[in-house]
Amino acid sequence: MQMWPPEPSIHFGNFSMEKLYEGKAKILYPTEDPDVLLTIFKDDATAFNAQKKGQIQGKGAINCAISAALFRWLETLGIPTHYIDCPQNDQMLVKAVNIIPLEVVVRNIAAGSLCKQTGLKEGLVLPNPLVEFYFKDDALGDPLLTWERALLLGVTDEARLQTLKDLALNINQHLQRFFAQCDITLVDFKLEFGGDRQGKIILADEISPDTCRLWDNAQADPQARVLDKDRFRRDLGSIEAAYQTVEKRVLSQIERLQSQMGAF
């Protein structure tokens, strides 16, 4: 995330906070607890490395709700996350972590840049999930890294790189099953991880239509099935409705799981 100079503060409880960082989709603020940060989810939408910009009404609150629900659920499955609580519908309290400057992308079906770079046909089901690493650097355009390049750049060591891959594949298994129960296909998605004060790697950032490519199983049309930020990228329209559909299905599935497992 890009660092910005302090701007007008906001108030959380009785504590006044200066903005720490602002990224494309979220703003981070400190809290009274140095181990806790407040994330504000924005309605801003960007694509193509911020070359295309716009607003999606209500996106911040929708993405916050979806992410919170999925983080809570993943915690019950033994996946550590940075989630703590949501004080408001577009705000999330999270554990402070040192973000590893890698975007970890898992692909189940050929789409997006994978098709452009390889010539694979969109919609091709991959024989095995593909894990890719992208260097988080806006100036370089977040380039795709090989395993060896990631080690060469020193962004992490080999043991942690393997941990990131293993965690991503584990999360993918859980999310694929979850979204299938929502009648949605998880095509691909992006994850970010960070290390806490003890050095433990935990899942951070968000899981939402901004970071996942999601297709509606009830729609055969290749445009109508899109339920994610591709609607913004490709000017497909009905962006808010698509995000709302994902939110409704995710929260309904969470309610079903809670009725079976108890509250989480």
Swiss-Prot record:
The keyword Nucleotide-binding applies. It comes from the Bacteria. PROSITE patterns: SAICAR_SYNTHETASE_1 (PS01057), SAICAR_SYNTHETASE_2 (PS01058). SUPFAM superfamilies: SAICAR synthase-like (SSF56104). Its EC number is 6.3.2.6. GO terms for molecular function: ATP binding; phosphoribosylaminoimidazolesuccinocarboxamide synthase activity. Pathway: Purine metabolism; IMP biosynthesis via de novo pathway; 5-amino-1-(5-phospho-D-ribosyl)imidazole-4-carboxamide from 5-amino-1-(5-phospho-D-ribosyl)imidazole-4-carboxylate: step 1/2. Belongs to the SAICAR synthetase family. It catalyses: 5-amino-1-(5-phospho-D-ribosyl)imidazole-4-carboxylate + L-aspartate + ATP = (2S)-2-[5-amino-1-(5-phospho-beta-D-ribosyl)imidazole-4-carboxamido]succinate + ADP + phosphate + 2 H(+). One of its GO terms (biological process) is 'de novo' IMP biosynthetic process. This is Phosphoribosylaminoimidazole-succinocarboxamide synthase. Keywords: ATP-binding, Ligase, Nucleotide-binding, Purine biosynthesis. The lineage of its organism: Bacteria, Bacillati, Cyanobacteriota, Cyanophyceae, Synechococcales.
